[in-house]
Amino acid sequence: RRFSELLKSYKENPDSFKVNYRREKPTRRIDKVTEEAILTELKIEKDLIDLDDNPIVDYNYSYIKDRLESEHHTTAALPTIIDRAKKHGFYIKKKNKVAHDREVVTNYAGELVQHDSSHHKWSPYSDKKWYLITSIDDCSRFLLYYNLVEAETSWAHICALEDVALIYGLAYSYYFDCHSIFRFVQGRDSFWRNHYKVTDDVDPQVKKILTDLGIKVRYALSPQAKGKIERPYRWLQDRIVRTCAREGVKEIGDAIEVLKEEAERYNFRQRHSVTGEVPYYRLRRLKDEGKSLFREFVLPSPYLSSKDIFSLRDERTVNPYRKISFNKLVFDIKGAPIREKVDLRIVPDMISGMAEIRMWYKDNFIGIHTARNEDINLNNFK
């Protein structure tokens, strides 16, 4: 229709015909409300960067863009926000970084799960630092597990392993840094001056569980490779700290709610910069295409419960009185000969404060005892 109108105008007066279009108002101008909202968010960012003991060191303009939509109910293009930041002094020039040359490349979901923790002051209004524990599928970039805890223990990481196994299945391999919770390193973790045990001769609690489940374990052997694990944390860390600061979060429970919201955004709405896909839809597509190495969790024989797998492990020798001693606690033992070793599978309950101690002799389940978590000394388990 428009073409017909133009053709008619041309035929009526070809000498004076023009197609010039006059704009009635500029298109690159944003309204005053949006302008003020951008500056407000930029000022909050600057105050956050200036705080001491704070992991945030630069501006996140993409985060501000999201805040404009969610909190101010307006929109602005990312280049516009950056332009205003430069004009008003809210800009820090990025440093040149050395390219990471040891990428772990995977082709299947579940081929490799990156697992680690990050210790930071997640809210400037809290007087404590907390640990963020996450597990992320390398191929899909989907966050399989995420939680904030006040203390980093082997048990906290075992809970993460259990959640991933029961919800998503058993992965082909796990990728860790060389923290003592994940790996025994001779010289660093040995108490003996004559080092009869060399690196990897002693399996930490986490590795014992993965070995029982037939899951391979890989380690980051360089600072560059460790950066591969830490990069997913930077995105979460960046947004969690900023949101906690804006919402005045003081308690870990409130911070966990912020974490859930950001993880939900990351998993189900955020298009990943590397894959170009939303992690959830990429994970689902890989499964639909038969490109998943996740196996269904099946309880290994002869165990009776998932508690026998996802537990802290120890062993004790039955004394002539058919008792064992554990952290100054004494338990009667039935079903195991004296001078024989009994396997302990310990499952703490953080809500009740009590731990269930499941006793095994070889392939036989011989009973359950209970003890207070504090008497077990969870921090001693590596």
Describe the function of each predicted region.
Residues R1-K11:
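Double-stranded DNA-binding cores of transcription factors and transposases
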Residues E5, D66, D83:
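DNA-binding alpha-helical recognition surfaces that contact promoter or target DNA
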Residues S9-F17, T74-T75, D83-N96:
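Short, basic alpha-helical nucleic acid-contact segments in DNA-binding proteins
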Residues E24-A77, S118-P124:
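A short, amphipathic alpha-helix used for macromolecular contacts
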Residues V98-H115, T134-I136:
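Well-ordered mid-protein domain cores that form the structural environment of catalytic cofactors
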Residues L112-L132, D138-D254, A371-E374, L378-K382:
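RNase H-like DDE/DDD metal-dependent nuclease/strand-transfer catalytic core used by mobile genetic elements
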Residues A263, N267-K382:
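C-terminal, beta-rich DNA-binding module of retroviral/retroelements integrases
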